[in-house]
């Protein structure tokens, strides 16, 4: 019917569909498929495959990059259009809401990153932070260490307390995983855990220089805040882990099995942290 109306009047498909309150996508789906619509169907299947493989974590830009890596060449706007038409909406982290630590670090270290460019190589600057993880009817606490060059999570620790041992465990894991040189910078907020004697002794023992954000200014440590937001949006979706074992297993799978090795990072020109580090190693 729509075709006959457009053929007998000066109105286009858009206007006729608006008057009849029929979605244009329904009309095009019912109409005899064109070469373009056939190509759209094939592209949509590829988009679906990537979207499902990444559990709804990828928006159109990352999917477009993933398609290109598979030699499927198209415009990003086309991917966006097809995703909108099929209701594929990526998980979104909550808007960054500044949160302060207890700010109780004794003799806080200066901010060595202020007005400095991001590092050009791995193991030049690490950053750390702590966040709350909902588990059953209680909270656990996750401490991470991230390499600011590659955005790779190089160490993490999960515990039911906020003592300094939490951040020490995360740093110990990072030190075991990486080969560092003297003068590596470790940056954090002014939390008492990072200002504790035991943590500072650990840094000193490995010739690591400590850097801290200005008090009540978490924007100075936005890299770790960004990761925490991504983790909660893409794993929890406002839910809770069943228990501590479930939380530990899922966080391990997310960090070591996905975030570091499979997830494309926009800040790395849409490559993964592991591939980014490999490219730097080859270049040097």
For the regions a language model picked out, list residue spans one by one.
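Charged DNA-binding/catalytic regions of mobile-element recombinases
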Residues: 1-284
């Amino acid at each position: 019917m729509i075709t006959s109306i457009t053929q007998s009047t000066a109105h286009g498909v858009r206007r006729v569909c608006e008057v009849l309150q029929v979605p244009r996508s329904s009309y095009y789906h019912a109409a005899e498929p064109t070469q373009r619509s056939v190509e759209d169907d094939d592209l949509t299947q590829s988009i679906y495959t990537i979207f499902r493989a990444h559990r709804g974590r990828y928006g159109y830009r990352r999917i477009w990059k993933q398609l290109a890596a598979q030699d499927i060449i198209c415009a990003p706007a086309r991917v966006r259009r097809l995703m909108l038409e099929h209701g594929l909406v990526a998980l979104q982290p909550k808007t960054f809401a500044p949160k302060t630590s207890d700010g109780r670090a004794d003799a806080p270290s200066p901010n060595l990153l202020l007005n400095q460019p991001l590092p050009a190589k791995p193991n030049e600057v690490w950053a750390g932070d702590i966040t709350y993880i909902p588990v059953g009817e209680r909270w656990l606490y996750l401490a991470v260490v991230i390499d600011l060059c590659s955005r790779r999570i190089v160490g993490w620790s999960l515990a039911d307390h906020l003592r300094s041992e939490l951040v020490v465990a995360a740093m110990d894991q990072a030190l075991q995983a990486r080969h560092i040189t003297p003068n590596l910078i470790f940056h954090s907020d002014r939390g008492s855990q990072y200002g504790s004697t035991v943590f500072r002794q650990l840094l000193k023992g490995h010739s690591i220089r400590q850097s801290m954000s200005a008090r009540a200014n978490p924007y100075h440590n936005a890299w770790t805040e960004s990761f925490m937001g991504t983790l909660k949006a893409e794993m929890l979706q406002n839910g809770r882990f069943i228990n501590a074992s479930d939380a530990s297993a899922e966080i391990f799978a997310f960090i070591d099995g996905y975030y570091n090795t499979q997830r494309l990072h926009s800040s790395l020109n849409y490559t993964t942290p592991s591939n980014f580090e490999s490219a730097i190693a080859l270049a040097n």
